[in-house]
C-alpha cells in the first residue's frame, strides 16, 4: 500500500512511548489541510494509535480496535490480541477488506503495525513508521536512537522533521502524544 500525504512514527525509549504524525492532508495534488491530527489516545490514554490512509477508514479501524480490546471483558489490555483479531476481521470481512489505511498502535509495552493484508508486525527495534515518509522517518529514528541523551519525544520530533525535509507528501506540522511505560 502506498499512501501519500502522511508520516506516522512510534518510538519506545527511556520509559516513554511516543506516537507522532505530520499534519498534511492531500486531495489529489492539492494540500487541503496542513494541521490534521492523525493520532488518537484510546482507552483513557493507555493506548496511542496513528494512521496513514483514508481518514474515515482509519476512524472505523480505531473504533473496531477499541471494540476488540473491550470485548475481552476482563479489564486487561492486550493490544497484541486485539491487533491480531482486528487484522483477521480486516482481511476477511467484505466491508472492512475495502478499507484503505494502515495503523500503528502502542501501549506502555508494545508497538505494533496493523495492515489490511492481515499483517501485525512488532518491530525488532523500538521504532516503526508508516506512510509516504515512513522510510525516511524510520531511518532517521534508528540513527537518533543511538544518542542516549535524546528522549523518545525528541527522537520522534527530529525524525519527522527529517522526513518533512525530503518527502513532498509530509509536512512539519507535527503532533506528538506520549505515555509513560509501566
Curated annotation (Swiss-Prot):
One of its GO terms (biological process) is proteolysis involved in protein catabolic process. SUPFAM superfamilies: N-terminal nucleophile aminohydrolases (Ntn hydrolases). It catalyses: ATP-dependent cleavage of peptide bonds with broad specificity. Its EC number is 3.4.25.2. Na(+) binds at residues 164, 167, 170. It is an enzyme of class 3 (hydrolase). Keywords: Allosteric enzyme, Cytoplasm, Hydrolase, Metal-binding, Protease, Sodium, Threonine protease. It comes from the Bacteria. It is found in: Cytoplasm. Belongs to the peptidase T1B family. HslV subfamily. A double ring-shaped homohexamer of HslV is capped on each side by a ring-shaped HslU homohexamer. The assembly of the HslU/HslV complex is dependent on binding of ATP. Protease subunit of a proteasome-like degradation complex believed to be a general protein degrading machinery. This is ATP-dependent protease subunit HslV.
Amino acid at each position: 500500500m502506498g499512501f501519500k500525504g502522511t508520516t506516522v512514527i512510534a518510538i519506545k525509549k527511556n520509559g516513554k512511548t511516543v506516537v507522532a504524525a505530520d499534519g498534511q492532508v492531500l486531495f489529489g495534488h492539492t494540500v487541503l489541510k496542513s494541521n490534521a491530527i492523525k493520532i488518537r489516545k484510546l482507552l483513557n490514554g493507555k493506548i496511542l494509535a496513528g494512521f496513514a490512509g483514508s481518514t474515515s477508514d482509519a476512524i472505523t479501524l480505531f473504533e473496531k480496535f477499541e471494540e476488540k480490546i473491550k470485548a475481552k471483558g476482563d479489564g486487561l489490555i492486550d493490544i497484541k490480541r486485539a491487533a491480531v483479531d482486528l487484522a483477521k476481521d480486516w482481511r476477511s470481512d467484505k466491508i472492512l477488506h475495502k478499507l484503505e489505511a494502515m495503523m500503528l498502535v502502542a501501549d506502555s509495552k508494545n508497538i505494533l503495525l496493523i495492515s489490511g493484508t492481515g499483517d501485525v508486525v512488532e518491530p525488532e527495534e523500538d521504532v516503526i513508521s508508516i506512510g509516504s515518509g515512513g522510510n525516511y522517518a524510520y531511518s532517521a529514528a534508528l540513527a537518533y536512537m543511538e544518542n542516549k541523551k535524546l528522549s523518545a519525544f525528541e527522537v520522534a520530533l527530529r525524525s519527522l522533521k527529517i522526513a518533512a525535509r525530503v518527502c513532498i507528501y509530509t509536512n512539519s506540522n507535527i503532533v506528538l502524544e506520549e505515555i509513560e511505560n509501566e
